[in-house]
């Protein structure tokens, strides 16, 4: 569902490099202290998107007719909503840092 690992690794590097630069330039630890929370917030958003794409594009044997109708409604909404298309594009290429 989009190979999110590489995007997440790049964002980890972004957050870590900022934290290390701040620490070694001025001794500031604020970014270092927030590093895990900042990364995890982004990771869970990517995880949510991957889960959503999987449920949108795959069918599972344990799901019944109701879920099939929900999946079709979601696909219909996705194909007709500019806002939804923008959201999926933003998530697919990687959320802003």
Walk through the language-model features, giving the residues of each.
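Glycine-rich phosphate/pyrophosphate-binding beta-alpha loops
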Residues: 1-7
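C-terminal helical "tail/cap" subdomain of flavin- and related membrane-associated enzymes
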Residues: 3, 18-97
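A general alpha-helical scaffold signature found inside nucleotide-binding enzyme cores
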Residues: 8-11, 30
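Extended, folded domain segments that form the structural surfaces/walls around functional sites
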Residues: 10-19
């Amino acid at each position: 569902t989009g190979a999110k690992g590489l995007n997440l690794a790049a964002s980890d590097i972004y957050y870590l490099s900022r934290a290390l630069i701040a620490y070694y330039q001025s001794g500031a630890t604020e970014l270092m202290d927030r590093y895990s929370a900042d990364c995890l917030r982004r990771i869970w958003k990517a995880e949510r998107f991957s889960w959503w794409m999987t449920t949108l594009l795959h069918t599972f044997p344990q799901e019944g007719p109701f879920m099939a109708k929900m999946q079709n409604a979601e696909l219909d909404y996705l194909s007709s909503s500019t806002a939804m298309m923008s959201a999926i594009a933003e998530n697919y290429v990687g959320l802003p840092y």
